[in-house]
A protein has these predicted regions:
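N-terminal, positively charged, Ser/Thr/Ala/Gly-biased leader segments
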Residues: 1-67
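Active-site metal-coordination/substrate-binding segment of hydrolases
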Residues: 68-91
Length: 91
Protein backbone atom coordinates (compact mmCIF):
# COMPACT_ATOMS: atom_id res chain seq x y z
CA UNK A 1 0.00 0.00 0.00
CA UNK A 2 1.26 3.49 -0.78
CA UNK A 3 2.24 5.74 2.11
CA UNK A 4 -0.43 8.38 2.64
CA UNK A 5 -0.16 11.89 4.08
CA UNK A 6 -1.70 12.63 7.47
CA UNK A 7 -4.50 14.49 5.66
CA UNK A 8 -5.21 11.50 3.40
CA UNK A 9 -5.30 9.14 6.36
CA UNK A 10 -7.65 11.42 8.28
CA UNK A 11 -9.94 11.77 5.24
CA UNK A 12 -10.07 7.99 4.90
CA UNK A 13 -10.82 7.48 8.61
CA UNK A 14 -13.58 10.11 8.60
CA UNK A 15 -15.19 8.47 5.56
CA UNK A 16 -16.25 5.40 7.54
CA UNK A 17 -19.69 5.82 9.18
CA UNK A 18 -18.76 3.97 12.36
CA UNK A 19 -21.81 5.10 14.33
CA UNK A 20 -21.74 3.47 17.76
CA UNK A 21 -24.62 1.06 17.09
CA UNK A 22 -23.02 -0.29 13.88
CA UNK A 23 -20.00 -2.40 13.01
CA UNK A 24 -16.55 -0.84 12.79
CA UNK A 25 -14.97 -3.79 10.98
CA UNK A 26 -14.63 -2.06 7.59
CA UNK A 27 -12.55 0.68 9.23
CA UNK A 28 -10.54 -1.84 11.26
CA UNK A 29 -9.86 -3.81 8.06
CA UNK A 30 -8.48 -0.72 6.32
CA UNK A 31 -6.30 0.40 9.24
CA UNK A 32 -4.96 -3.11 9.73
CA UNK A 33 -4.08 -3.50 6.04
CA UNK A 34 -2.42 -0.09 6.02
CA UNK A 35 -0.29 -0.88 9.09
CA UNK A 36 0.55 -4.37 7.84
CA UNK A 37 1.76 -2.89 4.54
CA UNK A 38 4.58 -1.30 6.57
CA UNK A 39 5.33 -4.57 8.41
CA UNK A 40 3.62 -3.34 11.57
CA UNK A 41 2.24 -6.31 13.47
CA UNK A 42 -1.41 -6.10 14.54
CA UNK A 43 -3.98 -8.18 16.36
CA UNK A 44 -7.70 -7.80 16.96
CA UNK A 45 -9.91 -8.19 19.99
CA UNK A 46 -13.50 -8.81 18.88
CA UNK A 47 -16.70 -7.90 20.67
CA UNK A 48 -18.80 -10.80 21.93
CA UNK A 49 -21.04 -10.72 18.83
CA UNK A 50 -18.02 -10.23 16.50
CA UNK A 51 -19.56 -7.09 14.95
CA UNK A 52 -16.84 -4.79 16.28
CA UNK A 53 -13.17 -5.05 17.04
CA UNK A 54 -10.36 -3.20 18.75
CA UNK A 55 -7.08 -3.14 16.89
CA UNK A 56 -3.72 -3.36 18.62
CA UNK A 57 -0.44 -2.61 16.87
CA UNK A 58 3.16 -2.81 18.02
CA UNK A 59 5.89 -0.68 16.48
CA UNK A 60 9.53 -1.29 17.29
CA UNK A 61 11.26 -3.91 19.39
CA UNK A 62 9.29 -5.76 22.10
CA UNK A 63 11.01 -4.20 25.11
CA UNK A 64 9.77 -2.87 28.43
CA UNK A 65 8.50 0.69 28.50
CA UNK A 66 7.36 2.71 25.55
CA UNK A 67 4.37 4.78 24.63
CA UNK A 68 0.73 3.77 24.28
CA UNK A 69 -1.54 5.61 21.88
CA UNK A 70 -5.25 4.93 22.29
CA UNK A 71 -8.29 6.03 20.36
CA UNK A 72 -11.79 4.95 19.45
CA UNK A 73 -13.62 4.31 16.22
CA UNK A 74 -17.23 4.98 17.14
CA UNK A 75 -19.07 8.25 16.59
CA UNK A 76 -22.49 9.57 17.60
CA UNK A 77 -25.41 9.28 15.16
CA UNK A 78 -25.71 12.12 12.63
CA UNK A 79 -29.41 11.67 11.87
CA UNK A 80 -31.52 14.61 13.02
CA UNK A 81 -28.52 16.95 13.22
CA UNK A 82 -28.26 20.07 11.09
CA UNK A 83 -25.07 19.34 9.16
CA UNK A 84 -24.09 21.93 6.55
CA UNK A 85 -21.84 19.38 4.81
CA UNK A 86 -21.45 15.63 4.53
CA UNK A 87 -20.29 14.43 7.98
CA UNK A 88 -18.29 11.62 6.33
CA UNK A 89 -16.13 14.00 4.26
CA UNK A 90 -13.43 16.40 5.43
CA UNK A 91 -14.19 20.04 4.68
Amino acid sequence: MTELSAFEILAKLVSYPTVSDRSNLELIDWVEKYLNSFDIKTFRKYSEDKSKASLFAHVGPPIEGGVVLSGHTDVVPVEGQDWSSNPWELT
